[in-house]
């Protein structure tokens, strides 16, 4: 089975190709929109994805050394994400499905991150941290679905860091040589400032931390503010994670999503693993951020259990939660 996956939920347009036997991932091509200033504007994302889609599709097929006719199914991330960006990927997927008579596989973007994590880390039954620009979730698989034990009550961890560095003119770009701008700034900081620390059960709140940190700009060294906001945010995340580990008694902790690429977070998680005698499984950097390969792979799993959708019912779902998705391929 060969599945072509299309990712366009936010700033990245990606096309991946997966098959149902090793090496599983045959291609993983993408192009990310980087704003010249400010944040991501939906109209700019739509334009970027529309312009990049043909080139990225062609590159993926060339990388896998196949033609579109060799593909069995077309998988597409229908959500969650930014509406105009999602529509580009969905439109391309529908067009390919109709033109080449290929069944369409609906994929939840978050499930894509989780499933590529299972594949690349070889985790068996983990507690899962899904950390990205749009999501901060603590989850695990139980009785047919991924059940959420904790999540952000407002903005996501990645979004909080992005907004801060943008507001203080450290970004864009947000990622420089594989490091987030807040990590680079934090390297010269050492003073831990007093900022809000909000953990409620296994849920977290980052909006107050962001607001308070911005109010300190001009009053404290920027490097110390960056250091403090990062350390406090990560410590909040680790406390909520420890509570979930105590509740579930899991012996594996899998981390997926773009924030998983943070070196400083990885070090904290490794320390947590030693303290709790838990194996830490972190998705490789090349699969941490948004990519088409994870959509293709999750689509392959879904297709193996007959999960398809009619083209005329393939609506985008910008607020599609991970715990709303049935997972028939997992026991």
Curated annotation (Swiss-Prot):
InterPro entries: ATPase_NBD, Gcp-like_dom, KAE1/TsaD, Kae1_archaea_euk. Substrate binds at residues 130-134, 162, 183, 262. Its cofactor is Fe(2+). Its EC number is 2.3.1.234. It catalyses: L-threonylcarbamoyladenylate + adenosine(37) in tRNA = N(6)-L-threonylcarbamoyladenosine(37) in tRNA + AMP + H(+). It holds the Pfam family TsaD. One of its GO terms (molecular function) is iron ion binding. Keywords: Acyltransferase, Cytoplasm, Iron, Metal-binding, Transferase, tRNA processing. GO terms for cellular component: cytoplasm; EKC/KEOPS complex. The keyword tRNA processing applies. One of its GO terms (biological process) is tRNA threonylcarbamoyladenosine modification. It comes from the Archaea. Its main location: cytoplasm. Fe cation binds at residues 109, 113, 130, 290. Required for the formation of a threonylcarbamoyl group on adenosine at position 37 (t(6)A37) in tRNAs that read codons beginning with adenine. Is probably involved in the transfer of the threonylcarbamoyl moiety of threonylcarbamoyl-AMP (TC-AMP) to the N6 group of A37. Belongs to the KAE1 / TsaD family. This is tRNA N6-adenosine threonylcarbamoyltransferase.
